[in-house]
């Protein structure tokens, strides 16, 4: 069977990137079908970009391209493997990244297995802005060509085996090119805005949404000097480095500089703040990470020089990584970094290649 006659199942989200991915694969001669995943049972009404509207858009695109669209419900898997962990992390005072977990457990596990076993797929494809390259018999994950849209940060948990079974057609393009293709084809998704909500849950108001599942516990806001200057509505609504939504202005003694969250005392339900986005209490010289995933699946020992991102869209930070044991590493930055947040992911790179990453267990504060 020739490479180009192979069957690809495209994860159709109802967005422009997956729509154009399906068309690009058709142009490359693959046998293309779509799959729409429903991963959340609750419908919050028409004001949100609901699964029903997304499904209608996905169906319209598939009709236009002349391909079959399958649907599958992964709501149970999403609840058990993504959402419960997401809530547990917030409860513990950390700030998780559900999109990374969703890619790991749903898009590149449940979807990959379903496509291969139930639909006879040779490959799956998604609209992620990443690229793959085969080096020394292993598939590597590369940054997307469009540096503004690169999504490798969200896919660091993938193994080389999963990458080998996945295609990323728009990773070779820039976003404006993708929209232009969709417009030229007359696809309904051409001008649809990019989704920014929690993976699969949509554009709900975050505080309201989280409050349904975790009871909020108001508590004190104190400065780094120990002065009480306000009340927070729940630690879970705040993350390190956050400026908005604190409800405090300048103080009589302080400057007019804005306040930032510099620490969360979970045990005592206290939010600690300081003025200025470069306050020493916000800065870290490094971090400890755990729950490590390396794309090549080789255990990491010793030390290495590379770059790291501690959040999406951050400029790469040069660093030295040292193995502490099988599942923990110490990362020392070349220069102090602001707002390193436990629960988020640290993702490592060697040039264009995403090496893997782990969950930030603790930050190493700047000695004061």
Curated annotation (Swiss-Prot):
Segments for region (Interaction with tRNA): 149-151, 243-252, 311-312
Region described as Interaction with target base in tRNA: 97-99
Record-listed E.C. numbers: 2.8.1.13
Biological processes, Gene Ontology terms: tRNA wobble position uridine thiolation
Keyword list, A-Z: ATP-binding, Cytoplasm, Disulfide bond, Nucleotide-binding, RNA-binding, Transferase, tRNA processing, tRNA-binding
Reactions listed under catalytic activity: S-sulfanyl-L-cysteinyl-[protein] + uridine(34) in tRNA + AH2 + ATP = 2-thiouridine(34) in tRNA + L-cysteinyl-[protein] + A + AMP + diphosphate + H(+)
Annotated disulfide bonds: 102-199
Protein's name according to its UniProt entry: tRNA-specific 2-thiouridylase MnmA
Lineage of source species: Bacteria, Pseudomonadati, Pseudomonadota, Gammaproteobacteria, Enterobacterales
């Amino acid at each position: 069977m020739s490479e180009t006659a192979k069957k690809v199942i495209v994860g159709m989200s109802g967005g422009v990137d997956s729509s154009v991915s399906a068309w690009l694969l058709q142009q490359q001669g693959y046998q293309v079908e779509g799959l729409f995943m429903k991963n959340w049972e609750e419908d919050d009404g028409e004001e949100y970009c609901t699964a029903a509207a997304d499904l209608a858009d996905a169906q319209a695109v598939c009709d236009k391209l002349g391909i079959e669209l399958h649907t599958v419900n992964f709501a149970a898997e999403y609840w058990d493997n993504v959402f419960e962990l997401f809530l547990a992390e917030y409860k513990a005072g950390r700030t998780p990244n559900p999109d990374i977990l969703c890619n790991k457990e749903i898009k590149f596990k449940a979807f990959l297995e379903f496509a291969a076993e139930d639909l006879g797929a040779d490959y799956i494809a998604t609209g992620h802005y990443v690229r793959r390259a085969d080096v020394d018999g292993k598939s590597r994950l590369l940054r997307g060509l469009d540096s503004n849209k690169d999504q490798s940060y969200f896919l660091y948990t993938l193994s080389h085996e999963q990458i080998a079974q996945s295609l990323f057609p728009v990773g070779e393009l820039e976003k404006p090119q993708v929209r232009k293709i969709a417009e030229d084809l007359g696809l309904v998704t051409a001008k649809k805005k990019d989704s920014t909500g929690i993976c699969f849950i949509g554009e709900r108001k975050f505080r309201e949404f989280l409050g349904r599942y975790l009871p909020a516990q108001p508590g004190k806001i104190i400065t780094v000097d120990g002065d009480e200057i306000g009340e927070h509505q729940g630690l879970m609504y705040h993350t390190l480095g956050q400026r908005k939504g604190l409800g405090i202005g300048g103080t009589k003694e302080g400057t007019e500089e804005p306040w930032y969250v510099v620490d969360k005392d979970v045990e005592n339900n206290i939010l600690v703040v300081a003025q200025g986005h470069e306050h020493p209490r916000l800065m870290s010289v490094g971090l400890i990470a755990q729950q490590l995933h390396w794309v090549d699946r080789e255990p990491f020992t010793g030390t290495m020089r590379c770059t790291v991102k501690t959040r999406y869209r951050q400029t790469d930070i040069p660093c030295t990584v040292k193995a502490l044991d099988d599942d923990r590493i110490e990362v020392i930055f070349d220069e102090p970094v602001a707002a390193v947040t436990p629960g988020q992911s640290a993702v490592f790179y060697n040039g264009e290649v995403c090496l893997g990453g782990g969950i930030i267990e603790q930050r190493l504060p700047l000695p004061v």
